[in-house]
């Protein structure tokens, strides 16, 4: 009896240890990674204040998560642990491997897509649902939620930022090209029938690493297919921006990507 209790206790301890949140931190920031491989929050530490970036905790919106749309709606795959701070998931023969890594002093993700199937992978779109809590539904909670303010796909790289109503700014950058970006809205409601009010609150910001053509000319035009045995790699970093006016300079210093700053666009 005692031996059985000892075995059960050991198993329960192992399960609780596996389910614990992983704390990943450096001097200027701290990330909490859930047992499911998604982020719970990022805290950027400053001398005057800390900026906390919240992430969704519910299964439908938490992230980063690998997803693909093959023509019949989005499919999202669960992460399987695959090493320290590393996870993998598979959709339609394509494996996505995500590893949390420090990059240029910033919290970042290395994302690898590899086609292990027998046919070319040609999704409507596929990539990451970032999982940043963008849902603004009530006062005063929305002051701490990050709204996708600017996202820009270039042929050689990607950059953008999210901003809270209270003025905090979070930059997102990749030195590799990203096909497109998109957002998911809440479902909406009928009130009264038959009138349907479409949802307008953002439930997810997505980085579409791949997207079917056509795309705007400024977007990369070769990320619509992943051939058998082919793999592509992206680094995606989160960057704390001191003020919105320092966005271009900060992103350029961190990632080395070309940026244009236009303090004024109209002269009278």
PLM feature spans:
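Bacterial Sec-dependent N-terminal signal peptides
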Residues: 1-21
């Amino acid at each position: 009896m005692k031996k059985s209790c000892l075995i059960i206790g050991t198993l329960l301890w192992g399960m609780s240890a596996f389910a614990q949140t992983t704390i990943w931190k450096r001097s200027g920031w701290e990330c909490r990674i859930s047992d499911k491989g998604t982020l719970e929050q990022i805290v950027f530490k400053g001398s005057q204040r800390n900026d906390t970036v919240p992430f969704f905790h519910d299964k439908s919106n938490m992230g980063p998560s690998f997803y693909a749309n093959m023509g019949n709606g989005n499919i999202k795959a669960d992460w399987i642990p695959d090493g320290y701070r590393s996870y993998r998931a598979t959709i339609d023969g394509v494996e996505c491997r995500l590893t949390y890594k420090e990059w240029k002093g910033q919290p970042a993700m290395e994302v690898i897509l590899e086609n292990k199937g027998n046919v070319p992978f040609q999704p409507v779109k596929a990539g990451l649902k970032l999982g940043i809590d963008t849902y603004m539904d009530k006062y005063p909670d929305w002051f701490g939620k990050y709204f996708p303010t600017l996202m820009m796909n270039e042929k050689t790289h990607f950059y953008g930022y999210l901003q809270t109503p209270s003025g905090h700014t979070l930059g997102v950058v990749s030195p590799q090209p990203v096909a497109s970006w998109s957002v998911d809205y809440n479902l909406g409601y009928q009130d009264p029938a038959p009138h349907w009010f479409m949802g307008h609150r953002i439930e997810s910001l997505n980085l579409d690493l791949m997207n079917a053509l056509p795309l705007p000319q400024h977007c990369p035009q070769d990320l619509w297919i992943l051939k058998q045995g082919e793999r592509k790699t992206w680094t995606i970093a989160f960057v704390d921006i001191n003020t919105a006016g320092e966005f271009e300079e900060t992103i350029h210093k961190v990632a080395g990507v070309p940026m244009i700053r236009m303090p004024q666009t109209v002269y009278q």
